[in-house]
Amino acid sequence: MTSPARRFAFILTSARRDGNTETLARKAAEHLPPGSSQEWLNLIDLPLPPFEDIRHGSAHYTQPTGNERVLFDATLGCTDLVLVVPLYWYSLPASAKLYLDYWSAWLRVPPGDFRQRMAGKTLWGVSVISDKDQRCADPLVGTLAITADYLKMPFGGVL
């Protein structure tokens, strides 16, 4: 029996196009298992407005629309989520953090099954560091690892 084909969603989070991190991710994607599909989304092309946390008010989160919907569907539609995240000031780029902030809303969007649907998907990271001290990337890697753990996602690590 063969396993179902893997579906990789690559979320490009750099503030510049065609940077070193994206180049590394595209090179790595050439070696994905045969039959795997790839979807590449660039947050430059899918800007999100500032996230508003309304959890403790009377308002409720609504179904995503526009760019948020595109990202929501891609996030839930993949088997493997790859965050292509250049190291900015020892952590994630602002656009990557904003994308993850939206997950707080998606956890509460009816029917409220985002956590269950994310469980079992593998979260990966691709990053490039210019510093000789690899510890500079620890906050970035930690953010991804803890995010995966919170949603019961296997963490594939960071290339």
What does each of the following model-derived ranges do?
Residues 1-113:
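N-terminal beta1-alpha1-beta2 submodule of the flavodoxin-like/Rossmannoid cofactor-binding fold
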Residues 39, 157-159:
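Structural signal for short hydrophobic segments within the conserved structured cores
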Residues 112-157:
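Short, glycine-/small-residue-rich phosphate/pyrophosphate-handling segment
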